[in-house]
Amino acid sequence: MAKTSAVEKNKRRRKLVANHSAKRAALKATIMNQSLPIEERFKATLKLAELPRDGSKTRIRNRCEVTGRPRAYYRKLRMSRIALRELGNLGKVPGVVKSSW
């Protein structure tokens, strides 16, 4: 089980990304627009720097929904390989069967 603080921090980051994504995208578009004067683009850069760092999408870490484990994460199932194996053996993941040949 992952530390509760790490899981909660990641949840807080997801909320910040949801709140600031539109504003960040608008500022980035302004910064990348070559037709605008350099002063206006620089002001947009300063405003972007004032936004919280945790509001950036790259700060989010994919974590297992069951255990909170950050590594060996399957995106489709939103869980780690360990949780997948445990729940798969119990028959709680639809379509997962133990292989035999």
Curated annotation (Swiss-Prot):
InterPro entries, A to Z: Ribosomal_uS14, Ribosomal_uS14_bac/plastid, Ribosomal_uS14_CS
PROSITE patterns linked to this entry: RIBOSOMAL_S14
Q: Coiled-coil region(s) at which residues?
A: none
Instruction: Report keywords, A-Z.
Output: Ribonucleoprotein, Ribosomal protein, RNA-binding, rRNA-binding
Which ranges are annotated Basic residues under compositional bias?
A: 10-20
Q: Which GO terms describe its molecular function?
A: rRNA binding; structural constituent of ribosome
Task: Report if keyword rRNA-binding is assigned.
Answer: yes
Please give the Pfam families that the UniProt record associates with this protein.
Ribosomal_S14
Disordered: where is this region? 1-20
Mention any one GO cellular component term assigned to this protein in its UniProt record: cytoplasm
Q: Which SUPFAM superfamilies match?
A: Glucocorticoid receptor-like (DNA-binding domain)
Record-level GO BP terms: translation
| PANTHER family xrefs | 30S RIBOSOMAL PROTEIN S14, SMALL RIBOSOMAL SUBUNIT PROTEIN US14M
Report the protein's function.
Binds 16S rRNA, required for the assembly of 30S particles and may also be responsible for determining the conformation of the 16S rRNA at the A site.
**Assembly information from the UniProt record:** Part of the 30S ribosomal subunit. Contacts proteins S3 and S10.
Q: Which family does it belong to?
A: Belongs to the universal ribosomal protein uS14 family.
State the name under which the record lists this protein. Small ribosomal subunit protein uS14
**Annotated source species:** Sinorhizobium medicae (strain WSM419) (Ensifer medicae)
The taxonomy runs:
Bacteria, Pseudomonadati, Pseudomonadota, Alphaproteobacteria, Hyphomicrobiales
Q: Which gene encodes it?
A: rpsN
